[in-house]
Amino acid sequence: MKQPIDVKQRLPNAENSMMNDIQIQLAAKSDLEIVIQLTLDAFAQVSFESNIESEFGLVSGLSWQDRKSEHIRDDFKDPDGRVLLATVADRTIGFVSIRLNRKTKIGVIANLTVSADERNGGVGRVLIQAAIDLMKRESMELARIETLEQNDVGKSLYPKLGFRELARQIYYCQDLRDENLV
């Protein structure tokens, strides 16, 4: 049985009636495929994995979708990971996955996705707040989230929710399949 997490107390004056009906609950193993599909629908333009494929093509015969799907499977398998679903009327409209490091007390928001038809309605905010609340209950002392430069939504949203930019990282790749390596 999925455990609902009440978030309505954060939305008492929500103008959007859908927001009053949103439920946040822990994902079950049976939710894996819908979470993967939400991810693939959302991450084409904002995924490091899709950047790799755009530049180098398939790697080991695997598409960016294959690699990103594996990341989501890892989120579900992680004993210190949690996946929270946002649902309305039993329809999954988004999710957030987190990883809890009990030694460092740092919780990481690994993936966040809202279905295209529900974006810009506050669902992402609710999911992040639910993730933060869960991290606090699990005695985390710091919440961390990362985004790519090309993710304009993340770059705008995360600071509004209290996250502070600390550093930028540049990803480089070299094609080792090329016989003409320098």
Report residues per predicted region.
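Acetyl-CoA-dependent GNAT
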Residues: 26-30, 37-110, 115, 128-129, ...
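Charged catalytic carboxylate motif
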Residues: 34, 126, 153
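Conserved GNAT acetyl-CoA-binding A-motif
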Residues: 135-146
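Conserved acetyl-CoA-binding loop-helix of GNAT-fold acetyltransferases
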Residues: 114, 120-133, 156-160
